[in-house]
């Protein structure tokens, strides 16, 4: 009995085959949302592909989803339009520029940080609007450096994106701030360079200027 005949007799096999295919060949897709648009990026065999869809004003505001179901369906529809099988997709979320804050920490205490709880114990004065106890923290440390970057975002905002992707039955592989992801790439390109760099970042028609010394923002 051939596979086609088995699938005709036992339709549940289609679901099983899709699940097996998702495990054997997951597709990594970057999702970079803005208030006005969604951006997707993924790699094929020979190049990087991208897709963008405009959003109505009532779906996302200040980086936070307002309608989980509709926004989730919009993401799923765009993936299907680009030929993806949803069970195969692993989403890597790049949080919008306006949704996070970061600070540079220096010294022995900074290099000893391994997670957000370590920072909460120290209770440093970071001078940002987030509460250390109520936000999600990511610590970015680098080898052969006495500095670390701490990135924070509201737990409510991150959970809203988790809920949105769940509405579309899409697994969230990881989440990272768009700016820190871009910074890591820039740091790798200029690794070991003892110089200062001026980094211009466009944000909703406005420019953000960052000064980098030895790879770290001043």
Outline where the language-model segments fall.
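Short acidic, S/G/P-rich loop/turn micro-motifs used as interaction or catalytic elements
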Residues: 38, 59-60, 99-102, 206
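Short, well-ordered beta-strand segments
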Residues: 30, 92-94
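Small-residue (GG/TT-enriched) beta-loop-alpha framework at ligand/catalytic clefts
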Residues: 2-7, 11-53, 85-87, 128-218
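Internal amphipathic helical hairpin motif
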Residues: 57, 68-69, 83-84, 95-149
């Amino acid at each position: 009995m051939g596979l086609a005949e088995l699938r005709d007799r036992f339709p549940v096999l289609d679901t099983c085959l899709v699940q097996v295919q998702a495990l054997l060949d997951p597709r990594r897709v970057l999702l970079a949302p803005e208030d006005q648009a969604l951006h997707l990026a993924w790699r094929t065999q020979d190049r990087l592909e991208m897709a963008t869809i405009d959003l109505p004003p009532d779906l996302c505001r200040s980086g936070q989803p307002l309608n989980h179901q509709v926004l989730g369906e919009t993401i799923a529809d765009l993936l299907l339009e680009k030929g993806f099988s949803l069970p195969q997709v692993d989403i890597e979320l790049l949080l919008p520029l306006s949704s996070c804050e970061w600070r540079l920490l220096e010294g022995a205490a900074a290099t000893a940080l391994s997670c957000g709880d370590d920072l909460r114990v120290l209770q440093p004065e970071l001078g940002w609007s987030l509460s250390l106890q109520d936000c999600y923290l990511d610590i970015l440390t680098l080898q052969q450096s006495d500095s670390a970057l701490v990135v924070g975002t509201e737990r409510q905002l991150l959970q809203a994106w988790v809920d949105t992707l769940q509405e579309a039955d899409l697994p969230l592989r990881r989440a990272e701030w768009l700016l820190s992801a871009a910074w890591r790439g820039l740091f790798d390109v200029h690794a070991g360079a003892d110089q200062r760099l001026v980094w211009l970042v466009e944000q909703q028609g406005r420019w953000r200027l960052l000064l980098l010394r030895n790879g770290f923002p001043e």
